[in-house]
């Protein structure tokens, strides 16, 4: 299980915004969120 985690650029608050069963799906979701949020958030994939 992989978590997609966001962090607002100006704070240190992390939030789990989605999850995926495989790494490839997690990367796809990460890319979609990066396109949607632009540079306001840092998006990371974290393995559980």
Regions from the language model: what does each represent?
Residues 1-17, 23, 32-35:
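N-terminal acidic leader/helix
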Residues 13-14, 27, 31-48:
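Short, mixed-charge low-complexity intrinsically disordered segments
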């Amino acid at each position: 299980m992989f978590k997609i985690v966001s962090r607002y650029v100006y704070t240190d608050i992390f939030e789990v915004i989605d999850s995926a069963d495989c790494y490839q799906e997690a990367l796809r979701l990460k890319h979609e969120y990066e396109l949607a949020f632009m540079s306001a958030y840092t998006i990371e994939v974290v393995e559980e």
